[in-house]
């Protein structure tokens, strides 16, 4: 605009770009994101990871407000240890969640399992503090929230 003097914030906002990654499967998406962040000085957003995690955290925050509960005390089960599930777990923990258990098609993710990819091994170190073992059915016992980001129909009434 003529006569408009840019301030520092406008210069920072409008002079930068970002990278939006879309539909890149795990575990490749984690390595691509990591390398881009290392090599480029711009934000990297992976819709499947970060977009999903943001929406889930918003829903969790609202449900906790309605039920007058604290995120640190709530128990979360995330079914699906791919890009979305891992990112949801990370964001929940950054928001203060202490009790997050992840489940994949083989069962509850534990640090000692050898079949996991690097991203799953990393998240296994900071989740499942109760050292649960077993299946999804075992994981959801006593849980306050179930977050499903895998195949449909895996959670049954039983």
State what each model feature region is.
Residues 1-74:
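Glycine/serine-rich phosphate-binding loop and adjoining beta1-alpha1 elements at the start
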Residues 18, 144-145:
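Short, Asp-centered acidic motifs that coordinate Mg2+ and/or phosphate
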Residues 30-31, 88, 112, 156-158:
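Short glycine-/acidic-enriched loop or helix-start segments at secondary-structure transitions
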Residues 32-35, 39, 140-142, 151-158:
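Rossmann-fold NAD(P) dinucleotide-binding segment
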Residues 45, 101-103, 147:
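Hydrophobic/aromatic beta-strand patches that form the interior of the parallel beta-sheet core
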Residues 22, 148-149:
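Short, well-ordered coil/turn residues at beta-beta hairpins
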Residues 54-143:
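Glycine-rich phosphate/diphosphate-binding loop of Rossmann-like nucleotide-binding domains
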């Amino acid at each position: 605009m003529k006569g408009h003097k840019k301030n520092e914030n406008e210069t920072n906002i409008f002079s930068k770009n970002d990278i939006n990654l879309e539909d890149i499967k795990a575990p490749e998406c984690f390595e691509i994101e990591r390398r881009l962040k290392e090599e480029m000085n711009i934000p990297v957003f992976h819709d499947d990871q970060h977009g999903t995690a943001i929406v889930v955290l918003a829903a969790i925050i609202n449900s906790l407000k309605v039920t007058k509960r604290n995120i640190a005390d709530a128990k979360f089960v995330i079914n699906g240890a791919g890009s979305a599930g891992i990112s949801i777990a990370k964001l929940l923990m950054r928001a203060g969640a202490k009790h997050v258990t992840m489940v994949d098609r083989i069962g509850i993710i534990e640090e000692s399992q050898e079949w996991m990819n690097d991203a799953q091994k990393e998240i296994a170190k900071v989740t499942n503090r109760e050292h649960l073992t077993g299946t999804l059915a075992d994981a959801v016992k006593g849980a306050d929230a179930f977050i499903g980001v895998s195949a449909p129909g895996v959670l049954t009434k039983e």
